């Protein structure tokens, strides 16, 4: 079974490039301090890597 990751948006997307905004939205994060739980897949890990400066990640 794949590991679960708890992803929290900790910094605002205001003033960020459109591709970073789209990545945050694709992760399912809408507002500041919102949290989602996702499975650890290569696609999700790539998205996390792209916006790592805006989010915090913990194992769920």
From Swiss-Prot:
Entry keyword annotation includes Glycoprotein: no
Residue spans crossing the bilayer: none
Alphabetized GO MF terms: structural constituent of ribosome
InterPro entries tied to this protein: Ribo_uL30_ferredoxin-like_sf, Ribosomal_uL30_bac-type, Ribosomal_uL30_CS, Ribosomal_uL30_ferredoxin-like
Keywords for the protein's UniProt record, in alphabetical order: Ribonucleoprotein, Ribosomal protein
Cellular component annotations (GO), alphabetically ordered: cytosolic large ribosomal subunit
A Pfam family that the UniProt record links to this protein: Ribosomal_L30
Coiled coil: none
Annotated family: Belongs to the universal ribosomal protein uL30 family.
SUBUNIT field: Part of the 50S ribosomal subunit.
Name recorded for this polypeptide: Large ribosomal subunit protein uL30
Gene (UniProt): rpmD
């Amino acid at each position: 079974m794949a590991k679960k990751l708890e992803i929290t948006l900790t910094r605002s997307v205001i003033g960020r490039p459109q591709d970073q905004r789209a990545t945050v939205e694709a992760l399912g994060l809408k507002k500041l301090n919102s949290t989602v739980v996702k499975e650890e897949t290569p696609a999700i890990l790539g998205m996390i890597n792209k916006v790592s400066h805006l989010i915090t990640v913990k194992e769920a």
